[in-house]
């Protein structure tokens, strides 16, 4: 197990904990992007990165106010020399079917299609062993991390299939290959997310859909606020790392990446340069081998 974990973490030799020059020049002019969990942390950073890359329209989805994110995105776009994007803010709970259906309907009526969907909304839940906390709190993590991604994907796929990029990025966790005690709701839900992503990739590949899972790095956010202080030294990555990484990876359709699990700590140009090796060896898939 330890060998497999090490092989995955070090699959790409060059690694990063912050954004770097090679991924800061993505081009998203003409693209429409939707992001869940966009009000803070990684979601906000992803939105700002797309803004800086000239995205034409951005759909920000969250339960909390998004006015600050909207203004930050527009400022980043203008500062980078682009025309201000159309930024649509949608108040929605991804785990509520009616809420996300109404959100998708609003987006359809306003924009008609999307090119890229980033399922970033997530929940960690109570830190502690299986006896800690309440059962409802434990299950709520699955409601957000699995049901929420399912409902959002289900609602937005028709619009994605009308777009150019037809790409879904689901935010995963390194814990699926390197288990951590006291996260019995969060980590299994992220493992299930990988399989869900793979199934979506299989079901819609003939229609041109690309779907992959990305580990964003260890970024300190509101989600990690319940972690013990002893965990703090592990959170060494900036939100800008996943923000710029996702924008860079999705500027082109990477069909060969569909159904795979990648780390955004990896040097992405180096990762892409190994496409043939990855495809021929069927690498970067989370499977059981006996």
Curated annotation (Swiss-Prot):
Coiled-coil positions: none
Residues at the active site: 186 (proton acceptor), 190 (lowers pka of active site tyr)
**What Enzyme Commission number(s) appear in the record?**
1.1.1.-
Loss of this gene results in the following:
Impairs the synthesis of anditomin but accumulates andilesin D.
- Entry-linked Pfam families: adh_short
PANTHER family found in the cross-reference section:
CLAVALDEHYDE DEHYDROGENASE, SHORT-CHAIN DEHYDROGENASES/REDUCTASES FAMILY MEMBER
Q: Which family does it belong to?
A: Belongs to the short-chain dehydrogenases/reductases (SDR) family.
**UniProt name for this protein:** Short chain dehydrogenase andI
Encoding gene (name): andI
């Amino acid at each position: 197990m330890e060998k497999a974990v090490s092989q995955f973490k070090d699959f790409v030799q060059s690694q990063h904990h912050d954004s770097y020059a090679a991924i800061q020049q993505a081009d998203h002019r003409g693209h429409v992007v939707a992001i869940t969990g966009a009000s803070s942390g990684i979601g906000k950073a992803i939105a700002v990165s797309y803004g800086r890359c000239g995205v034409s329209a951005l759909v920000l989805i969250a339960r909390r106010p998004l006015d600050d994110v909207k203004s930050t995105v527009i400022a980043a776009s203008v500062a980078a020399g682009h025309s201000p994007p159309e930024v649509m803010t949608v108040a929605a709970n991804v785990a509520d079917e009616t809420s996300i259906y109404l959100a998708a309907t609003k987006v359809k009526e306003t924009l008609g299609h999307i090119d890229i969907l980033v399922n970033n909304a997530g929940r960690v839940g109570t830190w502690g062993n299986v006896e800690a906390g309440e059962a409802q709190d434990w299950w709520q993590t699955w409601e957000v991390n699995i049901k929420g991604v399912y409902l959002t994907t289900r609602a937005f796929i028709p619009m994605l299939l009308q777009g150019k990029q037809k790409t879904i990025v689901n935010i995963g966790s390194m814990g699926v290959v390197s288990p951590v005690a006291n996260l019995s709701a969060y980590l299994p839900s992220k493992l299930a997310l990988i399989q869900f992503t793979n199934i979506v990739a299989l079901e819609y590949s003939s229609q041109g859909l690309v779907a992959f899972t990305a580990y964003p790095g260890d970024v300190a956010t509101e989600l990690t606020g319940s972690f013990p202080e002893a965990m703090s030294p592990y959170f060494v990555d900036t939100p800008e790392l996943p923000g710029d990484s996702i924008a860079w990876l999705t500027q082109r359709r990477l069909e060969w990446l569909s159904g795979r699990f990648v780390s955004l700590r990896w040097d992405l140009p180096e990762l892409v340069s190994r496409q043939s090796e990855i495809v021929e060896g069927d690498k970067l898939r989370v499977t059981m081998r006996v």
